Amino acid sequence: AVISGKKFDVGFHVTTPSSFAVQIFIKKAVDSGSKFLVLETTSHALDQYRVFGIDFEVGVLTNVTHEHLDYHKTYENYLETKAKLLKMSKIAVVNRDDESFHQISNFKFLISKLVTYGIKKNADINPENFKFKTDLIGEFNKYNILAAIAACKELGISDKNIRKGIESFVLPLGREEVIYKKDFTAMIDFAHTPNAFEQILKSVRPMVKGRLIHVFGSAGQRDASK
């Protein structure tokens, strides 16, 4: 966790810590004078009530792909769990191009306001009505940026500051991280799902003149069907 430029250890290797820890970090943010707080909320956290009691101003759903089926068992269960975040939020921001959109739109009666973003279809926020520059590679990064744009605009952040944030953004370690670049290039990326592999490999392939060698491993005791 990063609060007012200071890093805090959230403990175990989990994206969203326990409800108690989440509230502690929220209090730290409030005490530090932070105006906005971004909380990555996993399906496990939603299902286990780790964010229970939090009134989200904006809930953002990036995409719903083949992930965590060892826990949720079916795609439908996974989608319904992810949708809980949107029901907890005053404003729901969703990917208009994602295959889950049709089902998500069926939850409209539970969502106060629905805002869409996308590249291929007629979305509220798209590269045509909000132009931006970025050095990040891959279509998936464009989608992530559009999601952030939609959320920021709903929070009243100016277009100038949004573009400034996009242009200055640096990916965290382990995300498209080039660790060697001499006689060949070596890159580390966190991709570990079928969709993530497809996206990163499609993005890197045009940049490679010769062979593209992909090495990956499995942590085990997870969704084996991946």
Regions found by a protein language model. Give the residues of each.
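Acidic, Mg2+-coordinating active-site environments of NTP-dependent enzymes
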Residues: 30-41, 55-186, 209-210
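Active-site beta-alpha connecting loops in nucleotide-dependent enzymes
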Residues: 195-226
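Glycine-rich phosphate/pyrophosphate-binding beta-alpha loops
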Residues: 171-174, 188-199
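Conserved nucleotide-sensing/catalytic segment adjacent to the nucleotide-binding pocket
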Residues: 8-42
